[in-house]
């Protein structure tokens, strides 16, 4: 049966499908709750109420119950070019969205409705990619792609969730991505190539919310992206690419990894075919025992 995802910005490979999956943090009880072979679905968030996930497909935002029922689109008005960087407010009432075409941030009620622009207009290019929200719901953390073509830089910022001035937390030439607040608000977790000795060698880090006190959390030869902290603040799940990977592309043999919040050990949860879209945003369940991701297996 064809899926309802009629808008498509990126195509699956021949024989490939998108599998929205829930798994225990120890790698057990893997449950595919949605599988489609005609569309790319990406980047689940788990609603704080625990009953459903939200994800993006074809520039739109969708929701589905954790048992795989109740698939429906969340109305976002005139913004329908949404990428896979979105977060939910701690109270579960609002979803904050990154729109690809204009590079701006918006908020929409979780039930759907008219979007409200959160981000600012800039005299020079400043494309917003959203990743985190403070535990009190007042501040968003994001990366901005800044500068003209050929001189682009990716740095970390915060902005009030209700709109207001951007606050720069990094001003560097190497890539940074995925800034996400810890549940106690004391840290921002992120990925960076700040210590790379070869192109693309991103690792996991954390820093204080003012940009100080940077600590490295992974020291792998592999390429590690998007550390997502659990709601109880004890563990992170992140995605790990083979050495030599540039950025976080799709259609790669990757691993989902688990580490404690201080990075003192690292363990593989599951290996899969995926990458971009698999786990770009925080997808932990409220109980901190499970999380969601998308795999993209090629079946034939």
At which residue positions do the language-model features occur?
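Sequence signature of WD/YWTD-type beta-propeller architectures
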Residues: 1-300
